[in-house]
């Protein structure tokens, strides 16, 4: 009986072993059905996918264990992972580009509207108040506003010279209008300017407008220029191609888990960060100059307020013009007597009317309108958005990992570490190119920075210097900082024939501008300002010097 029971037990055990041998899934290659489904959903041919796992000696990127990926599949997925990251990078920067473009349009529209409203107010009020003093010289006022628009728009105009010429020519025109019966040749008008200088025929208006307009207009146009340059930098950097080493690392990060039969495993957080910190190391080097630019832009908005701020001055040019004509009417008799005393009696114009023009004595008192609050709202929104964007470049790897690459929420045994499901142990690298020398995931040659990004770093430096100069009221006579003409001083920029050269101005004659005729601008100042404008800083030599200093003397890392 005991022997029979033992025999039955042996038969049962043998049957169980046979059944297990026949039915154990682990004893056979695993199916690639899930990988086939994912691969086909990406538009690839299912004929490339094996039915079951195969040996992985052919793999060049993924670990060479049993795999569901052929060589062709690995290559296709590597190309797809690179394209997906480049698309994610473009999408990740698109919102910032849109924000900067919207800010640029908003501020540009506002400043243009202020200037247009000022000219409209002048055209409505001056004819009734000043009569022919204005109507016969209306073109001079239109030309002034046209040149102010060009200056704001980025044209290489010298604003002080522009204003100096305006006042000098206006004085000549009005003096001719006062004495139509006299012949007034150019040499007599030169003498007129010298005699008029100590008399300040226009009162303090020319000096006040010169001081305030220089600060206000340069602040406004430099700020709008800065928004354009920032947007250009983001746009160009977003298009910088990924390196081959980065492409390999991204393939391993995103799709090698599929090839190894664990498509549900998401990348470990620190693993993803190391891959993207290596891929975007050059982009992270923008951080310091990017912060400097945005800080300078936030700071210069302080120059938009107060009596000398852009809001008051750009929208109030006509107030100073009205004050000037009021003063000239008060000083006309004294001016005429002093000019004749100092320059002599001019010859009589045989074709003149024979009598002096009777000056109208109307005065124009304009009430300043309080700001509508539009600029305050624009500045408030811009400050918040610029501050939010300060850490954009160094936060980009983490943002892409969490929003675009389906990173795991925790680093544990269930996440993909590049080799298998399990914890990721290496430490996270720092930001920037120099910190990638020991990156375990991406081979980065820290001695070869990306030249496109280095050029954009230089553009940020140049623009920051202009903003700092504008904050101190200095016009650095800049041209467009970007190399393709976008991001110019206003949203529309300025015409090609105007930007990048001195804008020619038509005058009553071809002689030297009467800068010495202006109150508050001495003859020596006039000679200085009428000299050739300094050439704007060129990026090329500075860039070479900057790169020579910036490149770390570290040998390429071996693998």
Curated annotation (Swiss-Prot):
It comes from the Eukaryota. A lipid is attached at residue 530 (GPI-anchor amidated serine). It comes from Bos taurus (Bovine). Residues 1-23 form the signal peptide. One of its GO terms (cellular component) is extracellular region. PROSITE patterns: GLYPICAN. The gene is GPC1. InterPro entries: Glypican, Glypican_CS. One of its GO terms (molecular function) is fibroblast growth factor binding. The keyword Disulfide bond applies. Its main location: membrane. This is Glypican-1. It is a lipid-anchor; GPI-anchor. It is found in: Cell membrane; Endosome. Residues 531-559 form a propeptide. Cell surface proteoglycan that bears heparan sulfate. Binds, via the heparan sulfate side chains, alpha-4 (V) collagen and participates in Schwann cell myelination. May act as a catalyst in increasing the rate of conversion of prion protein PRPN (C) to PRNP (Sc) via associating (via the heparan sulfate side chains) with both forms of PRPN, targeting them to lipid rafts and facilitating their interaction. Required for proper skeletal muscle differentiation by sequestering FGF2 in lipid rafts preventing its binding to receptors (FGFRs) and inhibiting the FGF-mediated signaling. Residues 478-539 are annotated as: Disordered. Disulfide bonds join 32-68, 62-256, 69-259, 191-343, 246-279, 268-415, 272-401.
């Amino acid at each position: 009986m005991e022997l029979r029971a033992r025999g039955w037990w042996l038969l049962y055990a043998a049957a169980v072993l046979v059944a297990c041998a026949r039915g154990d899934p682990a004893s056979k290659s695993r199916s690639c059905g899930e990988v086939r489904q994912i691969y086909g959903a990406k538009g690839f041919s299912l004929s490339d996918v094996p039915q079951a796992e195969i040996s992985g000696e052919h793999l060049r990127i993924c670990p060479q264990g049993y795999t569901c990926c052929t060589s062709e599949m690995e290559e296709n997925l590597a190309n797809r992972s690179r394209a997906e990251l480049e698309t994610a990078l473009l999408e990740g920067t698109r919102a910032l580009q849109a924000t900067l473009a919207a800010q640029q349009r908003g501020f540009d529209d506002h400043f243009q509207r202020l200037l247009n409203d000022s000219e409209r107010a002048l055209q409505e009020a001056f004819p009734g108040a000043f009569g022919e003093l204005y109507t016969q010289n209306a073109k001079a006022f239109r030309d002034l506003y046209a040149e102010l628009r060009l200056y704001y728009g980025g044209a290489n105009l010298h604003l002080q010279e522009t204003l100096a010429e305006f006042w000098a020519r206006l004085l000549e025109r009005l003096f001719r209008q006062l004495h139509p019966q006299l012949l007034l040749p150019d040499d007599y008008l030169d003498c007129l300017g010298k005699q008029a200088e100590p008399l300040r025929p226009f009162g303090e208006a020319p000096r006040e407008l010169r001081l305030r307009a220089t600060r206000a207009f340069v602040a406004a146009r430099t700020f709008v220029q800065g928004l354009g340059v920032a947007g250009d930098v983001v746009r160009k950097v977003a298009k910088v191609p990924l390196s081959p080493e980065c492409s390999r690392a991204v393939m391993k990060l995103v799709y090698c888990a599929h090839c190894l039969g664990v498509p549900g495993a998401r990348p470990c957080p620190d693993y993803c960060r190391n891959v993207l910190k290596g891929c975007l190391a050059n982009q992270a080097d923008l951080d310091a100059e990017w912060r400097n630019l945005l800080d300078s832009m936030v700071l210069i908005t302080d120059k938009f307020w107060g009596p000398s701020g852009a809001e008051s001055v750009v929208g109030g040019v006509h107030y100073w013009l009205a004050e000037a004509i009021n003063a000239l009417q008060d000083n006309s008799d004294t001016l005429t007597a002093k000019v004749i005393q100092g320059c002599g009696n001019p010859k009589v114009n045989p074709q003149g009317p024979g009598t002096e023009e009777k000056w109208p004595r109307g005065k124009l008192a304009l009430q300043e309108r309080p700001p509508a609050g539009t600029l305050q709202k624009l500045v408030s929104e811009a400050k918040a958005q610029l501050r939010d964007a300060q850490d954009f470049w160094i936060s980009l790897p983490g943002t892409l990992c969490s929003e675009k690459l389906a990173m795991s929420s925790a680093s544990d045994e269930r996440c993909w570490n590049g080799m298998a499901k399990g914890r990721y142990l290496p430490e996270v690298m720092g930001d920037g190119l120099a910190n990638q020398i020991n990156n375990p995931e991406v081979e980065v040659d820290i001695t070869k920075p990306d030249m496109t990004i280095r050029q954009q770093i230089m553009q940020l430096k140049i623009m920051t210097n202009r903003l700092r100069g504008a904050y101190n009221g200095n016009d650095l006579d800049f041209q467009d900082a970007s190399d393709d003409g976008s991001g110019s001083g206003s949203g529309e920029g300025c015409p090609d024939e105007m930007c990048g050269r001195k804008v020619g101005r038509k005058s009553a004659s071809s002689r030297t501008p009467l800068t010495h005729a202006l109150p508050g601008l001495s003859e020596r100042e006039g000679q200085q300002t009428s000299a050739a404008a300094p050439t704007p800083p060129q990026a090329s030599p500075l860039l070479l010097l900057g790169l020579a200093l910036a490149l770390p003397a570290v040998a390429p890392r071996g693998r």
